[in-house]
Amino acid sequence: MNVIPTTGLFWGILCLYVFLVLGAGLFFARNNKSTEDFFFGGRRFSWWLIGMSMLATGVGSHSFAKYAAKGFEYGFSSTMTYMNDWFFMPLLLFGWIPIIYYMKVNSIPEYFERRFNSTVRNLSTFTMLLYLIGYIGIGLLALANLLQPILGWEIQSIIIIVAIISGTYVSLGGQTAIIFTDFLQGVILLFAGLLIFGLGISYLGGFDLFWDSLSLTNKLPLADFNSPPDFNFVGIFWQDGVVGSVGFAFMNQAVIMRFLASRSVAHARRATMMNVLVFLPIGTLAVSNSGWIGRAIANAFPDVIAESTNPNGIFTIVGSLVANSEPIFAFLVASVVAALMSSLDSQINASAAVAVNDVYTPLAKNPSEKTKLRISMFTSAFVTFIGIQAAFIFSQYGTIYEAHGAFHAIVTPPMVTVIFFGIFWQRFSSRAAIMTFVLGSIFIILGEMYPYELITPFAHGTEYIADRPYSYIKALYNMVACSSIAIVVTFLSKKPIDYSKIKGLTLWTIRDGQEYFKGSKVNSNKGSEIRFSASLIEIDEKLEGKTVRLPEKYSNQLKGETGDIIYISDTRWYLGGLKSTHAILGKVSDSDKILISKEVHEHAQFDFNRKIFIELEG
């Protein structure tokens, strides 16, 4: 293959970026005092920081590879795969987010044990690890395809190298490193994605020439209803819009951990709305437009970009053409590395969280936090190694988009079905959940073995191709099979549900979850926040746990009661909650000082020359 020429300057800029990311991992490692810090960043971050880091997780290297590829092949209709998140937002905002946050759920499998039983937890643990490791494999494969036009190496060699870098960084830094570096990487990848669009328009000679170089089919916002077989509206809707998008938001442990890293349910909701309504539409343009530019160049100048060009690497090829200097090209490539890091770090960290919380901890006998933290770091490295093997398997598919689609369609449906019925149908039973996993998997395997016989009735007229049967519509068949099993077994179950055991775990019992979160009745008589100089803080060695005691005047202003949860933070908004923590309001202090426990100070690390605020959380 032809290799894009580069010099030492290019590699210097790229290596500098990688070392900065690794440095961030080392810097933020000092914040990891427990597994809650390593996995959830202390549950203290502001919505804008969470929202941008969620964007960086969703818009990963696989996004630049697969959506740019579809943009190159089919034009503007590539965006339809990225704009399907709006219709399930109310269910996410007012159902799933408050349930997992208030019930202090650390992982999806843990939710399943509390909602159903340990058998369902074990089944979901296996599925979740399969899902996350598959995502790691897709990310590694995507970056390898994007870098191959520059390096000219074998795909397998590139996969191994980037996996080592990513695994090292995440194993050191944990969730706090992920959130802050993902924020920076989110800004970088959006800017780079939009920059390549501007450079591409300039390369073509203006927007009018770009527009005129696209065919009418390239300009359509949606693909044809059921053709061609490798990219059609109905297949993409079921595979990407329903199974893929719903699975990503509801069962992806990496996204769940973002919600749980927020300082409150309100901040998690704001982050989600900002991400879906603002960041993702911009992200869609950023990840797809290099494909559109590539298509316009191929149509206008077929001697520059041939029709036979591998679409998986079109971002890199277009970037090398339109960048008018090597530093700019290096920056564009670095942004793809940023996208990889932003996706891989979250998936690796999430895999370790599931392995430690749902496999190691239940088997171990009261392991210490230090031991669990060490196991977490080791597991991060181990799942990265397994992700390399997954990437090798996915490389057998024709395109990254099809590999990702097939992966979603097979792995996601049982888990998504059990989550949805568990949240929204109180009668949904443990037996039905088990059968959904077991029988649902059997039907999925049968669909893979006999696609023409079983999937054709669901195919909406899409063409059957023997070597790649129903690339996307199989997601609909799998969802129907799993949902049917869930409904039938639930209605046949005779054992009554003990509703007292699922309080707070369904949409209809969210209020119970708020009381569970606090540990007592929620204080609805919220006063105004209080602000003061940190010099008024005094560390009281006698206070146990994360306790704060306020003078009477501050207590009256806050209208807090003993036992209420408060949020105490540095007032600098741009820190995003880095110097903050939740605490428990103790008895009114006789002192003029704000008394805090040693544990509160260790988590928040206040600067005593700054301003601090306290707000009542419940």
Identify the residue ranges that each predicted region occupies:
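Membrane-embedded helix-loop-helix hairpins and adjacent transmembrane boundary segments
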Residues: M1-S535, K553
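Short beta-strand-centered segments at strand-helix junctions
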Residues: G527-S569, L578-E617
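Solvent-exposed strand-loop boundary residues in beta-sheet-rich modules
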Residues: R572-Y574
